[in-house]
Amino acid sequence: MKKYYVLITLIVLISLVAACAPTAPTSAPTDAPAAAAPTEVQLTENEQWAKDNGVGPYQPASEDWAAIEAAAKEEGSVCVYSNSSKIEKLIEPWSALYPDIKLDCGDTDGITTKMQAEQEAGNVVGDVWFNSDGHILYGMFMPNQWLWWYTPEGVVVSGVTAERPYAMQRHSIDVWGYNQEINPDGCPLTNWWQLTEAELNGKVFLENPLVDPSTTAKITLIVENADDMAKAYMDLYGKEWTTDEMAGPDAYGVVAENAGFLFLRKLARNHPVLEPGGDEVDEAYASLGMDSAIEPGYGLTGWDSYETTLDGELAMAPCLTMEPVVGIKKNSYVAIANKAPHPNAAKLFIKFALSEEGAKPWTAIGIYPGVDSLPLAEGMPAIGTYKLWESNDAFAWANNSAVRDFFATELLGGE
């Protein structure tokens, strides 16, 4: 028992000693580890070029135009690939402004193919894209960083957004043209569907959409705006387009998915004449002195062809009372080629092309300038006067191939 009390006493004493012992010092709090510096985004080779030259997303808010012009003079020339022969009319005013910088290249066939090949080969010749084919611009060239957008400071171009940054130099309107010499009282047509009727078999003219991507995009718009075409069918015939005898499956089991496809089927089976270019289209139905006893037909053409009529060289006039729309509004873009050999001269050219002087060759009936502040041609109605289909580059890029193949099949005898 005595040993038991001794043990208890020892335990109590040990506990007291432990309680009185000094507390171990608390460690000072350590600072939180410094946040790692953000990793700098690595630019692609093309992005680095764009940054070095101040184009695309790297364009500064303000630029020294005296320095740009001096650098452009050192470059000595600018190669502009244009799909319009009217660019030749810019040579004289350009040379007056910039005698030390040659305006080169000009009207060019196959611009998209040429510039794609140059970019893929790394042998860039063209400095500036001055072309339509927006579906290829946005669908292929922009994702591959082959073309950079550039709008000079202070220039307001309608339709330019963060998603659609390329400047539009002009908006051209395509319409159905008729021969006003044979039809002096006006266009006999009021509805697109009349173009598919037997009376006009072999009498509708257009550029070949099987080889011309711009025309392919135009007929793709018909499919995109199928609801408009359905209403126009009802307005003309008083019944739904689905009741048409050609709406069902063809010999291959292919049906017309909507009223736009039905229109293309009926047009194709009405034997349209596919021409190599716009001049040939106009000559086919609107040449002067055609036999009035023979139906001249109609052509899908630029409204600006009417300028040639005013010059006394053609009998084309636009059908301005057509349903569902009068025409198609298409865009011509300006952009700087990636790794352009003359980037400063390219900037000067775009600034010039977006000016009143640079727009003069295209200040014509049927064309609206891309810069809102520029004047219209005398007699040109304000934009919005007529209903037009707007070009849809994204839809065209996604659907052109399918629409072209459908049209080709119908031309070859889909029945």
Question: Which ranges hold each PLM region?
Answer:
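Short, low-complexity disordered leader/linker segments with a strong preference
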Residues: 1-75, 415
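Extracytoplasmic ligand-binding site segments that recognize negatively charged/polar headgroups
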Residues: 79-92, 104-116, 124-280
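Periplasmic-binding protein-like
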Residues: 156-160, 170-174, 263-267, 311-338
